[in-house]
UniProtKB/Swiss-Prot annotation:
NCBIfam families: small_GTP. Keywords: GTP-binding, Nucleotide-binding, Nucleus, Protein transport, Transport. PANTHER family: GTP-BINDING NUCLEAR PROTEIN RAN-2, RAN GTPASE. Residues 71-87 are annotated as: Switch-II. It is found in: Nucleus. This is GTP-binding nuclear protein Ran-2. PROSITE patterns: RAN.
Length: 221
Protein backbone atom coordinates (compact mmCIF):
# COMPACT_ATOMS: atom_id res chain seq x y z
CA UNK A 1 0.00 0.00 0.00
CA UNK A 2 2.00 2.97 -1.23
CA UNK A 3 1.33 6.48 -0.05
CA UNK A 4 0.12 9.15 -2.47
CA UNK A 5 3.56 10.74 -2.70
CA UNK A 6 5.33 7.45 -3.41
CA UNK A 7 5.88 5.92 -6.79
CA UNK A 8 4.43 2.44 -7.11
CA UNK A 9 6.52 -0.50 -8.26
CA UNK A 10 5.70 -3.12 -10.87
CA UNK A 11 6.08 -6.04 -8.45
CA UNK A 12 3.99 -7.10 -5.44
CA UNK A 13 4.03 -4.61 -2.57
CA UNK A 14 2.37 -4.73 0.84
CA UNK A 15 1.73 -2.37 3.72
CA UNK A 16 3.47 -3.73 6.83
CA UNK A 17 2.61 -2.06 10.13
CA UNK A 18 5.08 -2.38 12.98
CA UNK A 19 3.70 -1.85 16.48
CA UNK A 20 4.86 -2.21 20.07
CA UNK A 21 5.87 -0.08 23.02
CA UNK A 22 8.29 2.81 22.55
CA UNK A 23 11.93 1.81 22.92
CA UNK A 24 11.50 -1.80 21.85
CA UNK A 25 13.70 -1.29 18.77
CA UNK A 26 11.17 -0.97 15.94
CA UNK A 27 12.94 1.94 14.25
CA UNK A 28 16.37 0.35 14.72
CA UNK A 29 15.01 -2.81 13.13
CA UNK A 30 13.67 -1.23 9.92
CA UNK A 31 16.74 0.99 9.59
CA UNK A 32 19.04 -2.02 9.30
CA UNK A 33 17.90 -2.38 5.67
CA UNK A 34 20.09 0.08 3.77
CA UNK A 35 17.98 0.70 0.66
CA UNK A 36 14.83 1.11 2.73
CA UNK A 37 16.60 3.68 4.88
CA UNK A 38 17.79 5.52 1.80
CA UNK A 39 14.33 5.70 0.21
CA UNK A 40 12.17 6.32 3.29
CA UNK A 41 9.42 8.95 3.16
CA UNK A 42 7.88 10.91 6.00
CA UNK A 43 4.09 11.24 6.00
CA UNK A 44 3.32 14.18 8.32
CA UNK A 45 -0.46 13.81 8.28
CA UNK A 46 -0.20 10.48 10.07
CA UNK A 47 3.17 11.04 11.72
CA UNK A 48 4.93 8.01 10.32
CA UNK A 49 8.04 7.17 8.38
CA UNK A 50 7.48 4.69 5.58
CA UNK A 51 10.47 2.54 4.65
CA UNK A 52 10.22 0.60 1.35
CA UNK A 53 12.07 -2.68 1.98
CA UNK A 54 12.71 -4.85 -1.08
CA UNK A 55 13.52 -8.55 -1.01
CA UNK A 56 14.35 -10.82 -3.96
CA UNK A 57 12.63 -14.21 -3.88
CA UNK A 58 12.67 -17.24 -6.14
CA UNK A 59 9.35 -15.89 -7.50
CA UNK A 60 10.62 -12.37 -8.14
CA UNK A 61 10.90 -9.19 -6.10
CA UNK A 62 8.60 -8.23 -3.25
CA UNK A 63 8.33 -4.93 -1.41
CA UNK A 64 7.17 -4.20 2.12
CA UNK A 65 6.18 -0.62 2.85
CA UNK A 66 7.15 -0.64 6.53
CA UNK A 67 5.18 1.90 8.53
CA UNK A 68 7.15 3.10 11.54
CA UNK A 69 5.37 5.18 14.17
CA UNK A 70 8.24 7.64 14.73
CA UNK A 71 7.70 7.36 18.49
CA UNK A 72 4.12 8.59 18.71
CA UNK A 73 3.06 5.44 20.58
CA UNK A 74 4.73 6.96 23.67
CA UNK A 75 1.84 9.43 23.85
CA UNK A 76 -0.91 6.83 23.89
CA UNK A 77 -2.41 4.58 21.26
CA UNK A 78 -2.03 4.94 17.52
CA UNK A 79 -4.66 6.41 15.24
CA UNK A 80 -6.68 4.08 13.06
CA UNK A 81 -5.11 5.74 10.01
CA UNK A 82 -1.88 3.98 10.91
CA UNK A 83 -3.52 0.55 10.67
CA UNK A 84 -5.99 1.06 7.81
CA UNK A 85 -5.16 -1.04 4.73
CA UNK A 86 -2.45 -2.88 6.68
CA UNK A 87 -1.82 -6.21 4.97
CA UNK A 88 0.62 -7.72 7.46
CA UNK A 89 2.15 -6.77 10.80
CA UNK A 90 5.00 -7.17 13.26
CA UNK A 91 4.38 -6.74 16.99
CA UNK A 92 7.63 -6.09 18.81
CA UNK A 93 8.58 -6.30 22.47
CA UNK A 94 11.88 -6.03 24.32
CA UNK A 95 13.05 -9.20 26.09
CA UNK A 96 14.81 -7.00 28.68
CA UNK A 97 11.51 -5.33 29.69
CA UNK A 98 8.60 -7.33 31.12
CA UNK A 99 6.23 -4.40 30.66
CA UNK A 100 6.69 -4.36 26.88
CA UNK A 101 5.64 -8.03 26.74
CA UNK A 102 2.73 -7.41 29.11
CA UNK A 103 1.44 -4.80 26.62
CA UNK A 104 1.59 -7.13 23.59
CA UNK A 105 -2.08 -8.22 23.98
CA UNK A 106 -3.18 -4.56 23.84
CA UNK A 107 -1.23 -3.97 20.62
CA UNK A 108 -2.66 -7.16 19.16
CA UNK A 109 -6.21 -6.12 20.07
CA UNK A 110 -5.81 -2.63 18.57
CA UNK A 111 -4.30 -4.10 15.41
CA UNK A 112 -6.97 -6.76 14.90
CA UNK A 113 -9.78 -4.26 15.53
CA UNK A 114 -8.81 -2.53 12.27
CA UNK A 115 -6.96 -5.24 10.34
CA UNK A 116 -8.80 -8.55 10.41
CA UNK A 117 -7.17 -11.82 9.45
CA UNK A 118 -3.77 -10.51 8.39
CA UNK A 119 -0.52 -12.45 8.98
CA UNK A 120 1.22 -11.25 12.15
CA UNK A 121 4.69 -11.97 13.52
CA UNK A 122 5.57 -11.44 17.17
CA UNK A 123 9.23 -10.47 17.67
CA UNK A 124 11.17 -10.49 20.92
CA UNK A 125 13.99 -8.01 20.30
CA UNK A 126 17.34 -7.38 22.05
CA UNK A 127 18.21 -11.04 22.60
CA UNK A 128 21.87 -9.96 22.40
CA UNK A 129 21.49 -8.47 25.91
CA UNK A 130 22.66 -10.84 28.64
CA UNK A 131 20.16 -10.10 31.42
CA UNK A 132 16.89 -10.77 29.63
CA UNK A 133 13.80 -10.39 31.78
CA UNK A 134 11.37 -12.27 29.53
CA UNK A 135 12.61 -15.85 29.23
CA UNK A 136 12.03 -17.77 26.03
CA UNK A 137 9.75 -20.27 27.80
CA UNK A 138 7.60 -17.43 29.18
CA UNK A 139 6.62 -16.20 25.73
CA UNK A 140 3.24 -17.85 25.16
CA UNK A 141 1.01 -15.15 23.63
CA UNK A 142 1.78 -16.21 20.06
CA UNK A 143 0.55 -19.72 20.80
CA UNK A 144 -2.75 -18.44 22.17
CA UNK A 145 -3.37 -16.31 19.08
CA UNK A 146 -1.71 -18.54 16.48
CA UNK A 147 1.01 -16.04 15.61
CA UNK A 148 4.55 -16.74 14.42
CA UNK A 149 7.25 -15.86 16.98
CA UNK A 150 10.91 -15.05 16.37
CA UNK A 151 13.66 -13.95 18.71
CA UNK A 152 15.66 -11.19 17.05
CA UNK A 153 18.46 -8.74 17.71
CA UNK A 154 18.16 -5.69 15.51
CA UNK A 155 21.59 -4.37 16.44
CA UNK A 156 23.36 -7.61 15.56
CA UNK A 157 21.16 -8.42 12.52
CA UNK A 158 20.26 -11.75 14.16
CA UNK A 159 17.19 -13.29 12.46
CA UNK A 160 16.53 -10.03 10.58
CA UNK A 161 15.06 -11.73 7.51
CA UNK A 162 12.88 -14.31 9.27
CA UNK A 163 9.82 -12.12 9.98
CA UNK A 164 9.84 -10.84 6.39
CA UNK A 165 10.22 -14.33 4.92
CA UNK A 166 7.33 -15.66 7.02
CA UNK A 167 5.08 -12.77 5.97
CA UNK A 168 6.12 -13.07 2.30
CA UNK A 169 5.22 -16.78 2.30
CA UNK A 170 1.84 -16.09 3.88
CA UNK A 171 1.03 -13.23 1.52
CA UNK A 172 2.11 -15.21 -1.54
CA UNK A 173 0.38 -18.37 -0.35
CA UNK A 174 3.59 -20.27 -1.06
CA UNK A 175 5.33 -22.06 1.85
CA UNK A 176 8.31 -22.84 -0.40
CA UNK A 177 9.06 -19.23 -1.29
CA UNK A 178 12.57 -18.21 -0.26
CA UNK A 179 14.93 -15.27 -0.55
CA UNK A 180 17.61 -15.69 -3.20
CA UNK A 181 19.77 -12.64 -2.47
CA UNK A 182 21.25 -11.43 0.78
CA UNK A 183 19.79 -8.10 1.88
CA UNK A 184 22.18 -5.16 2.25
CA UNK A 185 22.21 -4.49 5.98
CA UNK A 186 24.17 -2.14 8.20
CA UNK A 187 27.15 -3.86 9.84
CA UNK A 188 26.32 -5.44 13.22
CA UNK A 189 26.74 -3.00 16.12
CA UNK A 190 26.87 -5.65 18.83
CA UNK A 191 27.97 -9.29 18.88
CA UNK A 192 25.50 -12.07 19.64
CA UNK A 193 26.25 -15.19 21.66
CA UNK A 194 25.02 -17.84 19.24
CA UNK A 195 25.48 -20.67 21.74
CA UNK A 196 23.29 -18.84 24.25
CA UNK A 197 20.72 -18.13 21.56
CA UNK A 198 20.62 -21.79 20.53
CA UNK A 199 19.84 -22.56 24.16
CA UNK A 200 16.96 -20.05 24.08
CA UNK A 201 15.67 -21.59 20.85
CA UNK A 202 15.76 -25.02 22.49
CA UNK A 203 13.80 -23.60 25.45
CA UNK A 204 11.23 -22.23 23.00
CA UNK A 205 10.86 -25.61 21.32
CA UNK A 206 10.50 -27.37 24.68
CA UNK A 207 7.94 -24.82 25.87
CA UNK A 208 5.91 -25.29 22.69
CA UNK A 209 5.38 -28.92 23.66
CA UNK A 210 3.93 -27.97 27.07
CA UNK A 211 0.27 -27.14 27.78
CA UNK A 212 -0.50 -23.44 27.69
CA UNK A 213 -0.76 -21.72 31.08
CA UNK A 214 -4.12 -20.16 31.98
CA UNK A 215 -2.57 -16.71 32.03
CA UNK A 216 0.75 -14.87 31.98
CA UNK A 217 0.65 -13.62 35.58
CA UNK A 218 3.89 -15.40 36.43
CA UNK A 219 5.65 -13.22 33.88
CA UNK A 220 4.45 -9.79 34.90
CA UNK A 221 4.62 -9.74 38.69
Amino acid sequence: MALPNQGTVDYPSFKLVIVGDGGTGKTTFVKRHLTGEFEKKYEPTIGVEVHPLDFTTNCGKIRFYCWDTAGQEKFGGLRDGYYIHGQCAIIMFDVTSRLTYKNVPTWHRDLCRVCENIPIVLCGNKVDVKNRQVKAKQVTFHRKKNLQYYEISAKSNYNFEKPFLYLARKLAGDPNLHFVEAVALKPPEVPIDLAMQQQHEAELAAAAAQPLPDDDDDLIE
